[in-house]
Design a protein with these regions (language model features):
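Long, amphipathic alpha-helical surface segments
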Residues: 3-8, 12-15, 32-35, 54-57, ...
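Catalytic glycan-binding domains that act on GlcNAc-containing polysaccharides
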Residues: 16-23, 82
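Short, exposed beta-strand/loop patches in secreted or surface proteins that constitute
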Residues: 17-19, 48, 110
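Alpha-helical segment that forms one wall of the substrate-binding/catalytic cleft
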Residues: 42-78, 85-89, 93-105
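Substrate-binding/active-site groove segments that recognize
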Residues: 22-45, 65
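Short, low-complexity, charged amphipathic interaction modules
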Residues: 165-187
Length: 188
């Protein structure tokens, strides 16, 4: 999940080595308001901060599990664990951008596990958000929501999240082979 989420976030957040002001805080790296040092300490971004891509990667790797925990708290462990990893990556990107899954309609959609409903709700529930932003920023955010929705919509079930264990798959495969051999024997 983390690798897929990193890829999505890097694509849409972009990298900035220098701190910049964004809405309510200084940001740096991949849109983060924090800097994580190699010893694990974390601090807020300040006006003249500069970081490397490696430092930004470290901060992003620390933050993604935090956003995952926020989502799990909002939708429940059972609902979250049933989602395919690719869908989780799209939802982590959304939460990273908004801070959480604030819309009840989206939380409710996630709890159903219906990927099409989740994707449609993600796009429609945020369509009129950010009305105060410039048209180019609104367009970029809409494109991001569409991309996240497509990730969710096209996600393939994880074997475990689909409720199928490796033991079940192997058992079914062995049963199919045995049945095939048995049917050949009966025909002979």
């Amino acid at each position: 999940v983390i690798t897929q989420a990193v890829d999505v976030l890097k694509k849409f957040e972009g990298f900035s080595a220098k701190a910049y002001w964004d809405v309510n805080a200084y940001r740096i790296g991949y849109g983060s308001d924090t800097i994580t040092s190699s010893n694990g300490s974390v601090r807020s971004v300040k006006k003249n901060d500069v970081i490397t891509k490696q430092q930004a990667d470290l901060d992003l790797a620390r933050r993604i599990p935090e956003f995952e925990k926020v989502i799990i708290k909002q939708v429940g462990t059972e609902a979250w664990n049933k989602l395919p990893d690719q869908a989780k990556a799209g939802l982590i990107s959304f939460a990273y951008n908004y801070g959480s899954i604030a819309k009840k309609s989206l939380r409710d959609a996630i709890k159903t596990g219906d990927l099409n409903l989740i994707a449609d709700t993600l796009v429609s529930s945020t369509y009129n958000d950010n009305a105060k932003l410039s048209s180019s920023v609104r367009t970029a955010l809409r494109n991001r929501r569409k991309y996240e929705a497509e990730l969710i919509r096209t996600a393939k079930p994880n074997i475990i999240s689909a409720g199928i264990s490796i033991k079940t798959i192997l058992g079914a495969s062995l049963l199919a082979v045995a049945f095939s051999l048995l049917s050949k024997y009966i025909k002979a």
